[in-house]
């Protein structure tokens, strides 16, 4: 399936991004990665903050492709767009982030203590790697957004 198919299905809509919007989103990512590294916060909060940073990176990619998610399943669609943009080799990364999405929802809405410090550290490390991948992709495909 392609992003055009997603648009035709009504899952995403057209969006024109800008360098300023991308800069603002990267600033959120950097802030969230810094905050998530604080061991003064619970593992649940650190995990949720790191998840937000990863989600913003997926958002940057989707925006750079000229789309934004519709309201229904917005996080899910944004995450699942990762392999459509960066390539099929990122399918496992999208699957991992979807598992993180579910866990983040659990610790945000249902119960405390479901995320461990190791979970938070793993997601922080993953997000740092994804940040490098997103910057490299933008430099190659949409340098005007950097």
Where on the chain are the PLM-derived regions?
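Terminal alpha-helical segments
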Residues: 1-146
């Amino acid at each position: 399936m392609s992003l055009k198919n997603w648009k035709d299905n009504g899952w995403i809509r057209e969006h024109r991004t800008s360098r300023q919007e991308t800069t603002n989103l990267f600033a959120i990512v950097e802030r969230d990665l810094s905050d998530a590294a604080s061991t003064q916060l619970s593992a649940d909060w650190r995990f949720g903050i790191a998840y937000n940073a990863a989600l913003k990176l997926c958002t940057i990619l989707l925006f750079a492709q000229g789309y934004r998610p519709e309201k229904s399943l917005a996080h899910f669609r944004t995450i699942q767009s990762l392999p459509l943009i960066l390539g099929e080799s990122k399918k496992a990364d999208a699957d991992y982030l979807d598992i993180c999405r579910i866990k983040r929802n659990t610790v945000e809405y249902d119960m405390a203590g479901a995320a461990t410090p190791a979970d938070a550290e793993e997601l922080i490390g993953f997000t740092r790697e994804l940040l490098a991948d997103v910057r490299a992709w933008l430099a190659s495909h949409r340098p005007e957004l950097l």
